[in-house]
Amino acid sequence: MSDEKICVGAIAGAYGVRGELRIKSFCATAEDIETYSPLTSEDGQRHFHLALVRPIKGGFVARIAEVSSKEEADALKGVQLFALRDQLPSLPDDEYYYTDLIGLQVLDTGGELLGSVKTVADHGAGDILEVQRPGTSETILLPFTRAVVPTVDLLAGKLIADPPEGAL
């Protein structure tokens, strides 16, 4: 069993006065966050038994067994929620968890090093890779599409990119 943790959501704050919380889910099917319970904090010191109550704009109202007041709920604002990788579903060959992409070397189609993946962001229309250029603080943004990133090789720790004109 793998001890690797994946961030599946975050606590956005209290909802009401009875200890309910606003939860943001980062799961492909947002409701699935409940099935990975108990979730942990990033350091693994806190465990949360999550039960979704109802959907709201931008997430869910949830109850956590360990939280019974607004003050306790407020204290958890910003806590990221993690599940063990083994709890998550296997992905098809052409899909990746963001955490697997971060740190990969990015090469252009000619084999030149463009940098490494710093972050992956979902901007609604699609995922964007932020690539840290080597030896500088400069970053470039690349759409994470098959046209721009035709090859991802997790075992080799790299991906091949064909940046759009003007991206560099």
UniProtKB/Swiss-Prot annotation:
The keyword Cytoplasm applies. One of its GO terms (cellular component) is ribosome. Coiled coil: none annotated. InterPro entries: PRC_barrel-like_sf, PRC_RimM, RimM, RimM_N, RimM_N_sf, Transl_B-barrel_sf. One of its GO terms (biological process) is ribosomal small subunit biogenesis. Its main location: cytoplasm. An accessory protein needed during the final step in the assembly of 30S ribosomal subunit, possibly for assembly of the head region. Essential for efficient processing of 16S rRNA. May be needed both before and after RbfA during the maturation of 16S rRNA. It has affinity for free ribosomal 30S subunits but not for 70S ribosomes. Binds ribosomal protein uS19. HAMAP family: Ribosome_mat_RimM. Belongs to the RimM family. This is Ribosome maturation factor RimM. It comes from Roseobacter denitrificans (strain ATCC 33942 / OCh 114) (Erythrobacter sp. (strain OCh 114)). The gene is rimM.
